[in-house]
């Protein structure tokens, strides 16, 4: 059982998945900080400039709704949505680039395979050249055998 588990863990796809999860987590943290540190303040600034409010809290106050003491923070949802979209888009670009490189490698392998002729190909070519140099002999049919004339 331990041997099977070791083979399972050492399989390339499991290791790739583990690396992807770790990198994805780290990347999500970076994107979250970019959204919270840059994009959200820019959106707040746009709200302040367009609405004429004195602070971002006043301008974004409409993004937090209170209904009977329950607070709905629409700004957090928008921030999470922006984070998700940026993360998904960057991961899409990474996967697209990886697939392109993978396909390029397959094309190069296919080109290499086509270039190398086999010994059977050489023998066929020799046979065809010899057949082209000597004219075919006439054959005459006698009872059950062919004889050359």
From Swiss-Prot:
Its main location: membrane. It is a multi-pass membrane protein. Pfam families: MscL. It is found in: Cell membrane. One of its GO terms (cellular component) is plasma membrane. The keyword Metal-binding does not apply. Keywords: Cell membrane, Ion channel, Ion transport, Membrane, Transmembrane, Transmembrane helix, Transport. InterPro entries: MS_channel, MSC/AndL, MscL_channel. GO terms for molecular function: mechanosensitive monoatomic ion channel activity. The chain crosses the membrane at residues 8-28, 74-94. Channel that opens in response to stretch forces in the membrane lipid bilayer. May participate in the regulation of osmotic pressure changes within the cell. PANTHER family: LARGE-CONDUCTANCE MECHANOSENSITIVE CHANNEL (PTHR30266:SF2), MECHANOSENSITIVE CHANNEL MSCL (PTHR30266). HAMAP family: MscL (MF_00115). Homopentamer. Belongs to the MscL family. This is Large-conductance mechanosensitive channel. It comes from Enterococcus faecalis (strain ATCC 700802 / V583). The gene is mscL.
